[in-house]
Amino acid sequence: MGVNVRPIIVRQEIRPETLRGRVLAVDANNMLYQFLSLIRTPDGVSLKDREGRTTSHLAGLLFRTTRLMVDYGVGFAFVFDGPPHPLKARVLADRRSAREKAMTEWGEALKRHDFQTAWSKAVVMSKLDQAMISDAKRLLSCMGMPYVEAPGEGEAQAAYMAAQGDVWAANSRDYDTLLFGSPRLVRYLTVSGREFLPSKGTSRPLIPELIELPCFLSHHKITREQFIDLAILVGTDFNEGITGIGPKTALKLVQQFGSLESTPDNIRERLPQDFEAIRGIFLRPNVRQDYSIVQRPMDEHCLFRFLCQERGFSPERVRIAVERLRAIAKSRQELGLVRWLGEHS
């Protein structure tokens, strides 16, 4: 879900081509969830293999990722969530309830042959389980793509990697990486440049965005600590927000009073009792420092065995992805040679 601060975000629209040669730390769970939600049959059922195992996320990971890399020259390091923080239990419970409600409504829509409604409810039913995550990691290994297993929040790990300068930016649809200290966040990096709206049965243009944390903080004349306090007022994955306080009101409060402790009594008494612990989640996140984002050669045999023999993918389609990976490897070799010649000329 993430924190809702969109109304106050300072963003700039960018062309995907401007990311050429950059490496992004991808919020892998967020990306895979998007694939699970949108890659479906007309009645809303996820793609599956002959054993009934979901493959929608694998199709998205293989074909859309390689397309972005070939078309725009961007690199990816995928970051997976570790065990959830105990304070996230409320959010996880809300998601379960929403899925259960959507499943009932999906079944009712199918009985009415209302496939548009069924499709929109199926999107909400999406659940990324450990088997799917294991399959995604296996696919990335076959592709030679780097991935990092975070000890806690994947967004915190991605932000750390960006802050260290090991990647250029974090890549997620949520804004939480900014709270965790990522200097840059890239949103809406897609192949089609459009977003499908299941409930309306239509789509809208989706333009990639770049958000730079220093620019955002400077624009609003706040610190990152105050940004975190603002998020706590609005609501995060670790606490419910205060009723009646949206992003704009929260911004005014932190600008006027400086911190949660200094807010008026009628605000302070409605704060979560553990707000200092929530601050700590963002300011002192649980991350790992021993990671590698080196891209390795793909293993073609591994790709065909896993996808075609075990998961029922078409060899012709997998061959397309293999050709893209070859092109990516060749491009990297040529770029490395150009850099070497430049350094030794």
Segments predicted by a language model, with ranges:
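Noncatalytic, basic helical substrate-engagement surface that gates or grips nucleic-acid strands
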Residues: 2-14, 18-164, 183, 191
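Charged, glycine/proline-rich intrinsically disordered loops and linkers
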Residues: 104-120, 197-215
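Glycine-enriched alpha-helix->loop->beta-strand junction motifs that scaffold or abut catalytic
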Residues: 166-168
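Non-catalytic nucleic-acid-binding/docking modules located in mid-to-C-terminal regions
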Residues: 3, 9, 13-20, 201-345
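Conserved NTP-donor binding/palm subdomain of two-metal-ion nucleotidyltransferases/polymerases, i.e.
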Residues: 51, 177-180, 191-203, 212
